[in-house]
Amino acid sequence: MNTSTSAFDFGSSTASSAATSTTSSQPDANDHLSRLAAMTQGVGKEDPETSSTPSTEASLYPGISAAYMQSYGWPQNYNYFGQPLGPATFPGWPQCYPNTAWPNYGELFASSKKGRQTYQRYQTSVLEAKFQQSSYVSKKQREELRLQTQLTDRQIKIWFQNRRMKAKKEKQRVDDHTEHTPLLPANPPKGMGMDMDDEKKWQMAHWPPAAAHNPYQYPLCPP
C-alpha cells in the first residue's frame, strides 16, 4: 500500500516538474526573441552611453553578434547622419589621380598678344622704302632707321625678317601661278594669225544661212 502511494507521489511530482519546465521554457523563448530583435535594431547606431563597450545583448549572444560583426561591421564604424564617414576605402586615390592644374587660357592669349609689335603707318613707310632698296640692312643703316622711326634695333631686325619672308611667299605664289598657266607668245607671227577680213569671211562661212524673205509667210492684216 505504501509502495503504490509513493509511486503515485513520484508520478505527480514528475508531472508537476514537467509542467513547470514547460511554462518556464516559453518565457525563455520569448525573451530570446526580444533580445535578438533589440540587438538587430541597434546595428548601425551608436549609443553615447555604450559607445566604448559592446552592448549586453551582444555579450549574451556571442555567436549571433559575431555573425553581424562579420556581415555589417561593428556599430562604431557607422556614424550619425550628417557626420563624416570613416577613412576612404582607397587611400591611394590622391596619389594616383592628383588635381589637374588647368592653364589659364586668358593669360596665355593676353601674353601672346602682348608680345606682338605694332608699327605706325609712318614707320612702315620708311622701312618699306628702305626694303625696296635693299632687303638686308647693315648696322649703320639700322641706326639711321632707328633715329627716323624711333624704333629699337631689335624691332627693325624683326620687321625686315618678316618682310623678307612675305616677299618670299609672294614670289613662290607667282611662280606656282605661272607654272599652271599655258605659255603663249606675246606677239605671235603673222602666219599664225588671221587678218580681219579673213576672220569675217570665216564667220560668214560658218554662220547658218538666213531664210529667204517671203512676203506671204505671215497673214496680212485686214485693211
Curated annotation (Swiss-Prot):
Cellular location(s): Nucleus
SUPFAM superfamilies assigned to the protein according to its UniProt record, in alphabetical order: Homeodomain-like
InterPro entries to which the protein is assigned, alphabetical: Antp_homeobox, HD, HD_metazoa, Homeobox_CS, Homeodomain-like_sf
Alphabetically ordered keywords of this record: Developmental protein, DNA-binding, Homeobox, Nucleus
Compositional bias (Low complexity): 1-25
One GO CC term on file: nucleus
GO BP annotations listed: anterior/posterior pattern specification; cell fate specification; defense response to bacterium; hindgut development; negative regulation of transcription by RNA polymerase II; nematode male tail tip morphogenesis; neuron migration; positive regulation of transcription by RNA polymerase II
Effect of inactivating the gene: Fails to swell on exposure to the rectal pathogen M.nematophilum, a coryneform bacterium.
Keyword Transferase: no
Principal location listed in the UniProt entry: nucleus
GO MF, one annotated term: RNA polymerase II-specific DNA-binding transcription factor binding
DNA-binding region: 112-171
Domain of life: Eukaryota
Disordered: annotated segments: 1-58, 168-191
Role summary: Involved in control of cell fate and pattern formation along the anterior-posterior axis, acting mainly in the tail. Required during embryonic and postembryonic development. Essential for the determination of specific neurons, including the PLM touch neurons. Plays a role in neural fate specification in the hermaphrodite-specific neuron (HSN)/PHB neuron lineage, acting in concert with T-box protein tbx-2 and the asymmetric cell division protein ham-1.
Family: Belongs to the Abd-B homeobox family.
Binding partners and assembly: Interacts with the TCF transcription factor pop-1.
Protein name listed in UniProt: Homeobox protein egl-5
Originating organism: Caenorhabditis elegans
